[in-house]
């Protein structure tokens, strides 16, 4: 626009809203503002009495700083809660923390340099509590810095006395229904952590293990197998051979007895070719053939112990690998244990809590199990029982806490019997909406196939298992009275009291053993699995808090929680209530780099959200979260974050343009009714209305990437590239009180008021900043206190949409023609052009009904002629039929004020450098 004596007559944008966001400095100021007005309480008061939407927070672990996975999770939750609280719901959000468990124990040990076995239990637990609470406070501030709104002053903690008290009641109710039992079973065991693990605490990684073929000499062939034969097994865990008591065959498979180099071997016929190739058997002779069931109860010698190994039958045997004759150690495998129970095999597990062999393993005593592989192989070789030893890389279970390989180990543990409520849990799954829908099958299959839940842990920092044992007969005691007593004690004192008091002090007065009548008891020393802690949160949080209710509307966590929190919560809820604790379950993927790799310090691809917030601002991270289809793994890198920052800049500039052009607009006095708006203005409201409908549906469907792309496209294309571009002359050059200018300002005002609300769930900080410049006296103090914009059927004018769609199609042809003319130096700015549109009759009729073509195309003159008169050089655009455009340099003088070239420039003697429109405006302004 003009730079000269008429500058002061232009309505140039005026706003204090800065172009540069400066988010790292601005956002903390907004956080302070929210704290000062107590935004969470204000919103709860506003929404009191409305229908509720309860998103129950899955508790993050109180250990370390937050990472991008936390960011993705918490921002997704915050987007949902903010949307719900602005769209007619009472949507409280109570953040929580998982505060017990092994990692906190390990950190307390590491930080203090103490030996937990030599430290007073209560003192050690105090150190653990201090560590957990320290990181609760650290993470709390980090989550708040992301703009996440919640009841940060009163979160739920699994270590709080109230939570622990209710958890005891959950355990007691499950025990009362017969779902809790103690049994000897193989469980996942971590020797490094010295405790049992649940399935949810196990992850699988690649591991190189031995791969050996071993001979078991036949001792008693039961008249079927010759006594000079050998049964061949294959295993990748030689360390389990000291616990071998059986060899399992499939009853329906064919087995062959063959002779190789003077020795007779038994193996499955279906694996003969593979084994022969592996062992280098060039010449062998098949001597006999059997069904697996014919070989049942044949007895073999153990390869190096004076012990029998019984041939048993099991459906779990496959022909995928090995020999079809499966080494069976009931003390070290689930299938082995079950088949061993069926045949009465001895359960041998000669391994201590640290994963080292006991005296029962004889010559291997003291060896760490994984280190013992070499010694076992040497023993087999010495006894000529080894056919081959090699290595294999395969998936192996690891402890997800310490990242060390784990073992199966038969020990006495407390279990929750999934069989007791499995069918009810499977039925409950189909009452829940799973987002994405594949989540249903995933958890259904896990519940259907999972074994009983090992809920005991041999550690210190956790909620004790509230069981007493009779000193006289050893029977366990748990009943309504003991549970009520322990629950009350925990509510008043926390679970430390279990370790500080004797059994007699913890039990109700007058307790006696229900089995033998004894009156002296000892306490259970194990604690509960932390998944039982968080799995009880629906009872410990949703039930007692007045602002919440059971069940919740939504659980939202990473896809690994189908086997974790979703699973444990479903189990406890179905066991107690017979129903799921949630109505919807939404899962997101993991954060990966641009190549799809996990975040890893060794790969150097870790993106730190705290650093990103310090450098770029939390709103950029929030926009990144919204831009991704979180149902898959979510990619992040400096380049991707840069793209989010660029998208943010465009959205911010759009809002700044609107704010700048509303500086002299009073919506209370100057609004223009819809019927008096120009067709272009009505088109803008139509596009806004469609945006409101699309964005609202996308929020309802949790498709936040659709929200992002719709808003971004609206700002950059519909507004910046089209509406604003066309509007600038009217806004800047018309008389300030011009009716058409006020009409445009009315539309801009409605657009920004809708945009600022729809942006709030995502751009929490920037929307608040925008609102601070937009709000009028008497309006809501915070943008978060506003209501969601409503669609308006009056704006859905199909005729306008169709007509403007065609006109904008033509605008593309004109733009292309202007670009070509500019490249040929025919014109400079588009206002230096006259255009001639050669149109078909259909186009001619449409364009004659369209006012202000010059303004739409931003040229000085637009002339309409029949298509038949088009010269050969007139430009046509592929896909746009019936239109050709010619561009020529405009003739006449350029208006100094608006830059339009037209013949009226010079006609006004007082303002000879202005066009007629500008001369009249200036005259009015100067009085």
Swiss-Prot record:
Its main location: cytoplasm. Binds 1 zinc ion per subunit. InterPro entries: aa-tRNA-synth_I_CS, aa-tRNA-synth_Ia, Anticodon_Ile_BEm, Ile-tRNA-ligase, Ile-tRNA-ligase_type1, Ile-tRNA_ligase, M/V/L/I-tRNA-synth_anticd-bd, Rossmann-like_a/b/a_fold. ATP binds at residue 601. It catalyses: tRNA(Ile) + L-isoleucine + ATP = L-isoleucyl-tRNA(Ile) + AMP + diphosphate. IleRS has two distinct active sites: one for aminoacylation and one for editing. The misactivated valine is translocated from the active site to the editing site, which sterically excludes the correctly activated isoleucine. The single editing site contains two valyl binding pockets, one specific for each substrate (Val-AMP or Val-tRNA(Ile)). Its cofactor is Zn(2+). Monomer. Gene3D superfamilies: 1.10.730.20, 2.170.220.10, HUPs, Ile-tRNA synthetase CP2 domain-like, Valyl/Leucyl/Isoleucyl-tRNA synthetase, editing domain. GO terms for cellular component: cytosol. It comes from the Bacteria. The keyword ATP-binding applies. GO terms for biological process: isoleucyl-tRNA aminoacylation. Catalyzes the attachment of isoleucine to tRNA(Ile). As IleRS can inadvertently accommodate and process structurally similar amino acids such as valine, to avoid such errors it has two additional distinct tRNA(Ile)-dependent editing activities. One activity is designated as 'pretransfer' editing and involves the hydrolysis of activated Val-AMP. The other activity is designated 'posttransfer' editing and involves deacylation of mischarged Val-tRNA(Ile). Keywords: Aminoacyl-tRNA synthetase, ATP-binding, Cytoplasm, Ligase, Metal-binding, Nucleotide-binding, Protein biosynthesis, Zinc. One of its GO terms (molecular function) is aminoacyl-tRNA deacylase activity. Its EC number is 6.1.1.5. This is Isoleucine--tRNA ligase. Zn(2+) binds at residues 895, 898, 915, 918. The keyword ATP-binding applies. Belongs to the class-I aminoacyl-tRNA synthetase family. IleS type 1 subfamily. A motif ('KMSKS' region) lies at residues 598-602. L-isoleucyl-5'-AMP binds at residue 557. It is found in: Cytoplasm. A motif ('HIGH' region) lies at residues 60-70. PANTHER family: ISOLEUCINE--TRNA LIGASE, MITOCHONDRIAL, SOLEUCYL-TRNA SYNTHETASE.
